[in-house]
Amino acid sequence: MALPAFAARALGPPLQPEQGAPARTTCPRRHSRVEAELAASRPGSVAASVRAGPPRGVSLGFNSPPLQDKPPKAFSSLAGALRAPLFALLPRGRRRRMHDLRRRWDLGSLCRALLTRGLAAVGHSLKHVLSAIFSKIFGPLASVGNMDEKSNKLLLALVMLFLFAVIVLQYVCPGTECQLLRLQAFSSPVPDPYRSEDESSARFVPRYNFSRGDLLRKVDFDIKGDDLIVFLHIQKTGGTTFGRHLVRNIQLEQPCECRVGQKKCTCHRPGKRETWLFSRFSTGWSCGLHADWTELTSCVPAVVDGKRDARLRPSRNFHYITILRDPVSRYLSEWRHVQRGATWKASLHVCDGRPPTSEELPSCYTGDDWSGCPLKEFMDCPYNLANNRQVRMLSDLTLVGCYNLSVMPEKQRNKVLLESAKSNLKHMAFFGLTEFQRKTQYLFEKTFNMNFISPFTQYNTTRASSVEINEEIQKRIEGLNFLDMELYSYAKDLFLQRYQFMRQKEHQDARRKRQEQRKFLKGRFLQTHFQSQSQGQSQSQSPGQNLSQNPNPNPNQNLTQNLSHNLTPSSNPNSTQRENRGSQKQGSGQGQGDSGTSNGTNDYIGSVETWR
């Protein structure tokens, strides 16, 4: 059977260019039969110097030399294994178009070649790296020539191991919040993460006298029951950051579910479809935008249990929490926020069952917003709610007639508002300060017995700190917020006293626990020693012989002698000698034996603690 023309040309020697013709090179590619015949009909041409390949469906002869840059079989199989799942990930319409393009332009061979050549290049580079490493370790035995087959298999194993690690990592950490952080939070904690906070803080001198009940804040929060945490969010106090900590950074049996693109998270109780947190990021602004204490106390029970009958409503404990900030910094931050177009028009300001009228609460600007407002204009408005905002939002406005300024004189009104805000703040379950992030985290954890996963961060640079004001403007801002200044001074004093009290209580509890462990170890040792001594005496001697040798037996003296011989080398030798001399004296009383027992046991306990 005669061979085809293209096969004969493929098996025959390649045509040489004409003598004197310039040497030219071309990129090897697949030729059709027509191109091969045309190339063969032009001896001396460039196409004649390139060996024509067979058409589709016809393989090369067994004598044809292999390509020099043919990748290993491992990479070809890996490319084929990776191409199918990658192609399956495309949408249905995209896959149909890719099939059409592949039938029309034959892109499969191009993709296959690119993938195999890329893997081959990576394999060769890794092979040289591995050969260099093995040559350093094993010497001349690890040569590149001897590692061709082994390195290819090793490379394939490394690639598969890498892909497996990526799959496991995507399973364990599916989103931006890796579950490993939650596992790390359940592990053993740092011995004392707040010691640096104690050392860095300056010495604090209290100004107010608070009782033990005011300083000791320990809330028995039952997240599986009906208790509810209500977050009172005051504008520009860092409440947004703290609110995110509550839904994203807190360690819970059933964490809040926060999905990408959604502003609210689902914070359900374990085993129930009820929320345990009433805040912006869990329930939204259900009582209005930045609702104050007056609105929340009358709105939250109706929102949570509004659909139930009054007789079937559970007896809930509403634990109110909030965050305060330095009044000057907060005022400047609100001014910068208003400059950017914030209005808080959605705030309801409901008091005593109705919102204020336009005469009771006039607006400081005309138009849609107050963007571009200068600081002087912001301070000149007498109806600006930014003035003394923290006192107004923490006090009971029903005591002063809500927003009706004609109910009582201004001086009396300010006094009632300030005292109401102080009282509500002191009786709140928890409040924090923006200027003390780590202390805020500590007090919240100790109050509710709920730990955060990662520590809070103290930001020293804010938009308010970037505003440069002179002393005159600062004095005026303090004058406009004189009630907030008084409230913040009171809150800071109470906050720092609570922190110091809780830290001292924690140290006392740790010291008491060590003492209990010491007593337990001492009793355990004495009990074990008496049992072993009594068993040894009963087995070695009879009762009559024991009485004849020692008419007045004293087990404490024997214990002292045994302790003096069995103590660790760290024990005091002088005390051992004194115990031996005391045991040899005749007529020694019970008190001397007890003294020796106490000394020997204390030395033993001390040696055990030194070893630990």
From Swiss-Prot:
<feature type="region of interest" description="Disordered">
    <location>
        <begin position="529"/>
        <end position="612"/>
    </location>
</feature>
<keyword id="KW-0325">Glycoprotein</keyword>
<feature type="binding site">
    <location>
        <position position="337"/>
    </location>
    <ligand>
        <name>substrate</name>
    </ligand>
</feature>
<dbReference type="InterPro" id="IPR027417">
    <property type="entry name" value="P-loop_NTPase"/>
</dbReference>
<feature type="binding site">
    <location>
        <position position="280"/>
    </location>
    <ligand>
        <name>substrate</name>
    </ligand>
</feature>
<feature type="glycosylation site" description="N-linked (GlcNAc...) asparagine">
    <location>
        <position position="599"/>
    </location>
</feature>
<feature type="compositionally biased region" description="Polar residues">
    <location>
        <begin position="565"/>
        <end position="577"/>
    </location>
</feature>
<feature type="topological domain" description="Lumenal">
    <location>
        <begin position="28"/>
        <end position="612"/>
    </location>
</feature>
<dbReference type="Pfam" id="PF03567">
    <property type="entry name" value="Sulfotransfer_2"/>
</dbReference>
<feature type="glycosylation site" description="N-linked (GlcNAc...) asparagine">
    <location>
        <position position="209"/>
    </location>
</feature>
<feature type="active site" description="Proton acceptor">
    <location>
        <position position="290"/>
    </location>
</feature>
<feature type="region of interest" description="Disordered">
    <location>
        <begin position="9"/>
        <end position="52"/>
    </location>
</feature>
<feature type="transmembrane region" description="Helical; Signal-anchor for type II membrane protein">
    <location>
        <begin position="5"/>
        <end position="27"/>
    </location>
</feature>
<feature type="binding site">
    <location>
        <begin position="457"/>
        <end position="459"/>
    </location>
    <ligand>
        <name>3'-phosphoadenylyl sulfate</name>
    </ligand>
</feature>
<feature type="binding site">
    <location>
        <position position="325"/>
    </location>
    <ligand>
        <name>3'-phosphoadenylyl sulfate</name>
    </ligand>
</feature>
<feature type="binding site">
    <location>
        <begin position="233"/>
        <end position="241"/>
    </location>
    <ligand>
        <name>3'-phosphoadenylyl sulfate</name>
    </ligand>
</feature>
<feature type="binding site">
    <location>
        <begin position="463"/>
        <end position="464"/>
    </location>
    <ligand>
        <name>3'-phosphoadenylyl sulfate</name>
    </ligand>
</feature>
<feature type="binding site">
    <location>
        <position position="285"/>
    </location>
    <ligand>
        <name>substrate</name>
    </ligand>
</feature>
<feature type="glycosylation site" description="N-linked (GlcNAc...) asparagine">
    <location>
        <position position="558"/>
    </location>
</feature>
<feature type="glycosylation site" description="N-linked (GlcNAc...) asparagine">
    <location>
        <position position="562"/>
    </location>
</feature>
<comment type="function">
    <text>6-O-sulfation enzyme which catalyzes the transfer of sulfate from 3'-phosphoadenosine 5'-phosphosulfate (PAPS) to position 6 of the N-sulfoglucosamine residue (GlcNS) of heparan sulfate.</text>
</comment>
<comment type="similarity">
    <text>Belongs to the sulfotransferase 6 family.</text>
</comment>
<feature type="glycosylation site" description="N-linked (GlcNAc...) asparagine">
    <location>
        <position position="404"/>
    </location>
</feature>
<dbReference type="GO" id="GO:0015012">
    <property type="term" value="P:heparan sulfate proteoglycan biosynthetic process"/>
</dbReference>
<feature type="compositionally biased region" description="Low complexity">
    <location>
        <begin position="531"/>
        <end position="564"/>
    </location>
</feature>
<keyword id="KW-0812">Transmembrane</keyword>
<keyword id="KW-0808">Transferase</keyword>
<feature type="topological domain" description="Cytoplasmic">
    <location>
        <begin position="1"/>
        <end position="4"/>
    </location>
</feature>
<feature type="binding site">
    <location>
        <begin position="263"/>
        <end position="264"/>
    </location>
    <ligand>
        <name>substrate</name>
    </ligand>
</feature>
<feature type="binding site">
    <location>
        <position position="333"/>
    </location>
    <ligand>
        <name>3'-phosphoadenylyl sulfate</name>
    </ligand>
</feature>
<dbReference type="GO" id="GO:0017095">
    <property type="term" value="F:heparan sulfate 6-sulfotransferase activity"/>
</dbReference>
<dbReference type="GO" id="GO:0005794">
    <property type="term" value="C:Golgi apparatus"/>
</dbReference>
<keyword id="KW-1133">Transmembrane helix</keyword>
<dbReference type="GO" id="GO:0016020">
    <property type="term" value="C:membrane"/>
</dbReference>
<feature type="glycosylation site" description="N-linked (GlcNAc...) asparagine">
    <location>
        <position position="460"/>
    </location>
</feature>
<feature type="binding site">
    <location>
        <position position="344"/>
    </location>
    <ligand>
        <name>substrate</name>
    </ligand>
</feature>
<dbReference type="InterPro" id="IPR005331">
    <property type="entry name" value="Sulfotransferase"/>
</dbReference>
<dbReference type="InterPro" id="IPR010635">
    <property type="entry name" value="Heparan_SO4-6-sulfoTrfase"/>
</dbReference>
<keyword id="KW-0735">Signal-anchor</keyword>
<feature type="glycosylation site" description="N-linked (GlcNAc...) asparagine">
    <location>
        <position position="574"/>
    </location>
</feature>
<feature type="binding site">
    <location>
        <position position="290"/>
    </location>
    <ligand>
        <name>substrate</name>
    </ligand>
</feature>
<keyword id="KW-0472">Membrane</keyword>
